[in-house]
């Protein structure tokens, strides 16, 4: 059975997300998109932009599959000096700020229905401890309760920080009995840390969707699948062997949009590789 072909609008993150970009995504083979909620791209606080996109989705075949929650609260991806949003922030005020911003973005599901919300649980440098584990339980329980009436499933993503390593994500979800929370497997981070096979084996049935892109195991390059050294046949086989094979979301770097003539072919080829 063919997988849904989902393209992340992260590819266009340096541009305002408008209906023309969504139309292009459909022409290039995407059946659905993941909306990347960076405010310079998709301003979830703008009634006008949300209404414009909602109207387009209602009248077109391309659907909104998921949303990537905000990583920064500013409109410059942190370049203004704004720190990353962090649900495990040492200060209570920082945790509240992160939760409020993520909830603001999630509320757009009332107008643009989507299935999953991908969330960064921690920031680089965060350490695994009883304190961060408790903050994680509290944050995800709250997010799950907020998401349920919206029809959204929050997904935590494996990152490069200790609390977001695969084994710790599983511990958080299972000890906390957080059955309403899933995992988005970030293949690039897995390849840079524990290895893709190990990440899939550890996260197993918690994986609901995958962020698919490539690298060489050192930098988070967001290359087209096949342009790095991830073993794609083995990866696809391992994911397909799960009881519920996850959705594959193509998430290439915005730098690759600087070669627009290549985009249609590269996107179609990537979807074919991902199955």
Task: Report residues per predicted region.
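Conserved beta-strand positions in the central sheet of alpha/beta enzyme cores
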Residues: 34, 66, 118, 155, ...
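Flexible, glycine- and charge-enriched loops at secondary-structure boundaries
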Residues: 43-46, 50, 88-95, 126-133, ...
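Catalytic-core regions built around general acid/base machinery
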Residues: 49-60, 139-146, 199, 234-238
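N-terminal pre-domain/capping segments
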Residues: 1-104, 110, 148, 178, ...
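Histidine-acidic metal/acid-base catalytic patches
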Residues: 1-6, 15-29, 58-59, 113, ...
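Active-site acidic/histidine proton-transfer and metal-coordination neighborhood
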Residues: 19, 74-182, 192
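Residue-level detector of anion-binding/catalytic polar loops
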Residues: 31-32, 63, 115, 153, ...
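Active-site-proximal loop/turn and secondary-structure-junction residues that shape catalytic pockets
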Residues: 11-13, 37-39, 70-73, 121-125, ...
